Amino acid sequence: MTNTLDANAAPAKPDPEPTRVKRWIVGLTGGIGSGKSTVAACFQEKGITVIDTDDIAHRITAAGGVAMPAIISSFGGDVATPDGALNRQRMREIVFEDPRQRKKLESILHPMIREISEREISLAASAYVLLAIPLLIESDHPRERVQHILVVDCPEATQIERVMKRSGLSEERVKSIMAAQATREQRLAQADAVISNHGNLADLQAQVDSLHEDFLTKAETWFGASASHGGQSPP
């Protein structure tokens, strides 16, 4: 029997999307071993929301992660550990020497990472958001999602020493990873602000303190300009 009420009723209007408050976003980046995580933790201690795209990538490639079915379908079952998580060592071997395979992996991960990070940004309550993207400068449009770029910088010799100490990788392996990233000069050329992370923690904290105050002012100014443009990002 046909339900004439349903058949003749006007289509239901979709629920309105929740209001998303525009956020002033600082893109945090730096080379491997530069100390991005330490800097991010300093900002978190000040109550700033930090969204780490590396952390999101680990979450979606853990056992049961939303990215794993597509990854296994594209690369085969040997890229997964017995519990269903991504075998990171195996995947590194596949994508490091083959740009096509790397692009394939990125085509799976990047849309998911972006969707999750955008959702988390929309829920942030802090005056501004720190969006940690290790390969921000290497992306095609580094300023597409951020209003300000903060680079964590240190000498390349310091990077190598730190990564070897924490990971056990050989010096040659660390250098090969660094060679696949933007150069120190390329990152600094794109930076709106720089944290020099080759001193002690007190020096690092002092730099964060100063930048935090500056970012609060910039975020307030930007938000006021955004409001005057009807909620759109100011030019």
Question: Where do the language-model regions lie?
Answer:
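Residue-level signal for inorganic ion chemistry
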Residues: 35, 54, 105, 130, ...
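ATP-dependent small-molecule kinase phosphotransfer cores
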Residues: 55-128
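An amphipathic alpha-helix signature
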Residues: 68-72, 156-164, 171, 175
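Well-ordered beta-strand positions
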Residues: 49, 148, 192-193
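Small-molecule kinase domains that catalyze NTP-dependent phosphoryl transfer to phosphate-bearing small molecules
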Residues: 116-117, 125, 143-144, 165, ...
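Glycine-rich phosphate-binding loop of ATP-dependent small-molecule kinases
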Residues: 1-86, 213-235
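ATP-dependent NMP and nucleoside kinases share a basic, alpha-helical "lid"
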Residues: 114-123, 129-165
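Short, acidic/turn-prone active-site loops that include or flank metal/cofactor-
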Residues: 55-58, 154-157, 176-179, 201
